């Protein structure tokens, strides 16, 4: 219900029609939303900026350029955006900016539809807030209640969680709400699909009346708009279509490998091709990244590797080496498939096909950034053919068998 900052200019802001007409409203970005092209010009605290760059972000995505400043101003915000647009970092950066670290009480509450997403949000907050000494807890079902209570008693600046468990903790008075300044509803449409409507309303009733509300949703069905009417004061609207990553100019190939073990030999055969410019090799798990890195090194190939479990400092120096061109081949997980620009990368290898098709464009859409041409090679086992065809269909693209002269194409 944050309406204090900048609620002037009724004419500037097209008034929303009556609620029942909302379905016909072409949801568009409010007129007063300006674009802030860099993280440096957002007025963020120094220790947060360090965390943002250390995490590997260089330039804010479309939603980050528009929403962060509005949220920091204290405005209620409705952002319509799909996953893959940088939405999580948008509210995470905003939340971290608004915290008073000296006060060991919960100041921001983030609700998410799944345990996995809540944990992902918590990890992202801890990574971005690495230099701020931020305390952040994931409050999710299926875990030990006693552990939750202990963590909350210790004092957490931010709590991310699923509505059921969060409400349970509020009811038990383990999660104190008096210092909460901001409520974030991530993937709000998904939460409603999962039947969390009652719990969200229950949680909301316990929050201080002036709590700022940020709602993120890929779709805006009637129930969501009903919720925004109840929870929000004069919200700013931001519509972000999915990142305009393109597969144009990127030649995509697959290599059929009968067995998992043969992927390694295929990679070794390709190594000389990899080092023509710079290459990123994607695996689906951290363990696989570590295993492949070790195996490549044992075979006397020079590679560097990175994933979310490595200490921040280590990741920073690996990224620095890779950016400078000192290391040519980087093995990584999807943590790095977003928000990273290394212009020299013109070859991507999917050692494992991504777990979901949206990640595909994040992995390889990057290799053609700045209008550069790129090549993507997918290692495909027999049972992956289905996934590959699905990716082709989803992106209306064509993935051919890799030719012998692939080096000439890079």
Swiss-Prot record:
It is found in: Nucleus; Nucleus speckle; Cytoplasm. It is an enzyme of class 3 (hydrolase). Its EC number is 3.6.4.13. Its main location: nucleus. A motif (DEAD box) lies at residues 186-189. GO terms for biological process: embryonic cranial skeleton morphogenesis; mRNA splicing, via spliceosome; mRNA transport; negative regulation of translation; nuclear-transcribed mRNA catabolic process, nonsense-mediated decay; positive regulation of translation; regulation of alternative mRNA splicing, via spliceosome; regulation of nuclear-transcribed mRNA catabolic process, nonsense-mediated decay. One of its GO terms (molecular function) is poly(A) binding. GO terms for cellular component: catalytic step 2 spliceosome; cytoplasm; exon-exon junction complex; nuclear speck; nucleus; U2-type catalytic step 1 spliceosome. ATP binds at residues 59, 64, 81-89, 341, 366-370. Residues 249-410 form the Helicase C-terminal domain. InterPro entries: DEAD/DEAH_box_helicase_dom, Helicase_ATP-bd, Helicase_C-like, P-loop_NTPase, RNA-helicase_DEAD-box_CS, RNA_helicase_DEAD_Q_motif. Keywords: ATP-binding, Cytoplasm, Helicase, Hydrolase, mRNA processing, mRNA splicing, mRNA transport, Nonsense-mediated mRNA decay, Nucleotide-binding, Nucleus, RNA-binding, Spliceosome, Translation regulation, Transport. Residues 1-20 are annotated as: Disordered. Residues 68-238 form the Helicase ATP-binding domain. It catalyses: ATP + H2O = ADP + phosphate + H(+). Belongs to the DEAD box helicase family. eIF4A subfamily. Identified in the spliceosome C complex. Part of the mRNA splicing-dependent exon junction complex (EJC) complex; the core complex contains casc3, eif4a3, magoh and rbm8a. ATP-dependent RNA helicase. Involved in pre-mRNA splicing as component of the spliceosome. Core component of the splicing-dependent multiprotein exon junction complex (EJC) deposited at splice junctions on mRNAs. The EJC is a dynamic structure consisting of core proteins and several peripheral nuclear and cytoplasmic associated factors that join the complex only transiently either during EJC assembly or during subsequent mRNA metabolism. This is Eukaryotic initiation factor 4A-III. It comes from Taeniopygia guttata (Zebra finch). The gene is EIF4A3.
């Amino acid at each position: 219900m944050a309406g204090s900052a900048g609620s002037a200019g009724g004419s500037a802001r097209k008034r929303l029609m009556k609620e029942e007409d909302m379905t016909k409203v072409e949801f568009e970005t409010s007129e007063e939303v300006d674009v802030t092209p860099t993280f440096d010009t957002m007025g963020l605290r120094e220790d947060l900026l360090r965390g943002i760059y250390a995490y590997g972000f260089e330039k804010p995505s479309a939603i980050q350029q528009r929403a962060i400043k509005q949220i920091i101003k204290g405005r209620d915000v409705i952002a319509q955006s799909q996953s893959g647009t940088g939405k999580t970092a948008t509210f995470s950066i905003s939340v971290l900016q608004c915290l008073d670290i000296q006060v060991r009480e919960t100041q921001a509450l983030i609700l998410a539809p799944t345990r996995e997403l809540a944990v992902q949000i918590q990890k992202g907050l801890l990574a971005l807030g690495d230099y701020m000494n931020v305390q952040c807890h994931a409050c999710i079902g299926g875990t030990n209640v006693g552990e939750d209570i202990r963590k909350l008693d210790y004092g957490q600046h931010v709590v991310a969680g699923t509505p059921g468990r969060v409400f349970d903790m509020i009811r038990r008075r383990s999660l104190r709400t008096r210092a909460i300044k901001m409520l974030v509803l991530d993937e709000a449409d998904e939460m409603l699909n999962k039947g969390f409507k009652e719990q969200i309303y229950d949680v909301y009733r316990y929050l201080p009346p002036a709590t700022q509300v940020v709602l993120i949703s890929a779709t805006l069905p009637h129930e969501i708009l009903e919720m925004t009417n109840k929870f929000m004061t004069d919200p700013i609207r931001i519509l972000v279509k999915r990142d305009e990553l393109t597969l144009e100019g990127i030649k995509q190939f697959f290599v059929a490998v009968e067995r998992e073990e043969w992927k390694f030999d295929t990679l070794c055969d390709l190594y000389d091709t990899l080092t023509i410019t710079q290459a990123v090799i994607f695996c689906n798990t951290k363990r696989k990244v570590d295993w492949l890195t070790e195996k490549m090194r044992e075979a006397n190939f020079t590679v560097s590797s990175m994933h979310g479990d490595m200490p921040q400092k280590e990741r920073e120096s690996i990224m620095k080496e890779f950016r400078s061109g000192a290391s040519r081949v980087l093995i990584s997980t999807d943590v790095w498939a977003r928000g990273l620009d290394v212009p020299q990368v013109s070859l991507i290898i999917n050692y494992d096909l991504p777990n979901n098709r949206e990640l595909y464009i994040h992995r390889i859409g990057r290799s053609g950034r700045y209008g550069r041409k790129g090549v993507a090679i997918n290692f495909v086992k027999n049972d992956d053919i289905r996934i590959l065809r699905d990716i082709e269909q989803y992106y209306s693209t064509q993935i051919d068998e890799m030719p012998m002269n692939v080096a000439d194409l890079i």
